[in-house]
């Protein structure tokens, strides 16, 4: 059975480092929205292109699943609904799904524990290699779905809804 590994964690938590280790272990293809922003070896992030980057990552993941390749989805995946397209693909193609945190799984828990400290801990987060500002990391942590350390239940992911879906439902009522 092929395997899909879904990485979880905020920017700078070591997801890509861990994904590269797992790539060797599982002979897997790594897909990430970040790769969409790579231009001639340089990371050129553009927030306006984020939806296109995630669609691109999903398309690449679907192609890998069609070929039966082991695949690693290396995005933040902080909310259950963000993982939903990948879990749906995994089910469609008969993949086993595993969840992994960054190189240091305690990073996310430590970040979550200090959220209440605000400005006092901003300096601690200014060292990630992506240059992601602390306030963005805090916003990612605020979206963290249930069971931050343990693997979420696939059924919870499959019934999860994005903020846009929830807003549309609210308008219909």
Description of each model-found segment:
Residues 7-9, 32-33, 73-76:
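Short His-Asn-centered micro-motif
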Residues 2-6, 29, 68-72:
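Residue-level preference for the first positions of well-ordered beta-strands
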């Amino acid at each position: 059975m092929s395997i899909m590994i879904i990485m979880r964690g905020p920017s700078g938590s070591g997801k890509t480092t861990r994904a590269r280790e797992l790539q060797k272990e599982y002979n897997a293809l790594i897909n990430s929205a970040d790769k969409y922003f790579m231009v001639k070896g340089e990371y050129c992030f553009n927030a306006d292109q984020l939806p296109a980057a995630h669609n691109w990552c999903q398309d690449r993941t679907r192609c890998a699943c069609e070929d039966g390749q082991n695949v690693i989805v290396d995005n933040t995946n902080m909310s259950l609904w963000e993982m939903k397209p990948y879990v749906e693909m995994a089910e469609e193609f008969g993949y086993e799904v595993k969840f992994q945190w960054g190189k240091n799984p305690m990073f996310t828990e430590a970040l979550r524990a200090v959220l209440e400290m605000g400005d006092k801990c901003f300096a601690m987060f200014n060292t990630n290699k992506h240059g992601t500002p602390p306030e963005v990391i805090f916003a990612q942590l605020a979206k963290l779905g249930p069971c931050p350390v343990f693997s979420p239940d696939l059924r919870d992911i499959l019934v999860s809804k994005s903020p846009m879906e929830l807003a549309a439902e609210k308008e219909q009522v």
